[in-house]
A protein has these predicted regions:
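A short helix-loop-beta-strand connector motif used in the catalytic cores of GNAT acetyltransferases and
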Residues: 42-54, 159
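A short beta-loop-alpha structural element at the N-terminal edge
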Residues: 1-17
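Conserved acetyl-CoA-binding loop of GNAT-fold acetyltransferases
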Residues: 130-143
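Conserved beta-strand in the GNAT
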Residues: 54, 60-68, 74-81
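Conserved GNAT-fold acetyl-CoA-binding loop/helix
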Residues: 20-43
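Conserved acetyl-CoA-binding loop-helix of GNAT-fold acetyltransferases
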Residues: 82, 88-105, 127, 135
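Conserved GNAT acetyl-CoA-binding A-motif
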Residues: 103-125
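Conserved acyl-donor/pantetheine-binding loop and adjacent beta-alpha core of acyl/acetyltransferases
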Residues: 45, 74, 126, 142-161
């Protein structure tokens, strides 16, 4: 499974459905019922601007990640998903490696990711991800209040949340 950037906006519905399916489980209890992580229109726009990479198994999209530049010399990845039936097969690792290589190819010194976490309880998926990102070299650089950074999201939350910002120095020789 080799992740690749895609340009076919016809895949937007399939990619959006996968993202929403994974996030509805991975962020259970964080969002009010009925909230979606993304939409077909948003994913189509991200595909059209070269920001979505997918991993395929045969004809099926089994994983995806969004990549983009957030500031000079810093890339970011997000919306990282692997189909639940494919977990443990290395798709997530392959997608993160793709994102980091995408950043290196553009001469970025760092990659960033943001992790939404509840303020008052530990979410098992979020704690797993926090540990995994740390094991693969990402370091927590700051904790931001969601209300300040993304106030438009707050009405959709089921509980107060922070987001954790992680960064990794990219070794250009890899």
């Amino acid at each position: 499974v080799t992740p690749v950037l895609i340009s076919d906006t016809g895949l937007a519905a399939e990619v959006a459905a996968l993202i929403n399916r994974v996030y509805s489980d991975a962020e259970k209890g964080i969002w009010l019922e009925g909230q979606s992580r993304t939409s077909e229109a948003e994913v189509a726009e991200l595909i059209a601007t070269g920001q979505i990479a997918v991993a395929r198994s045969g004809d099926r999209v089994v994983g995806s990640v969004r990549v983009h530049e957030i500031e000079d010399g810093v890339g970011e990845f997000g919306m990282l998903v692997a189909a639940p039936e494919e977990r443990g097969t290395g798709i997530g690792t392959d997608l993160v490696s793709f994102a980091e290589n995408w950043g290196r190819e553009r001469g970025f010194a760092q990659m960033q990711l943001e992790l939404l976490v509840p303020q008052t309880w530990e979410h098992p998926v979020k704690e797993f991800l926090r540990g995994w990102y740390t094991r693969i070299g990402y370091r927590l650089v700051r904790k931001d209040d969601l209300e300040t950074a993304y106030p438009f999201l707050v009405p959709h939350l089921a509980c107060p949340c922070d987001f954790l910002v992680f960064r990794k120095i990219l070794d250009p020789s890899k």
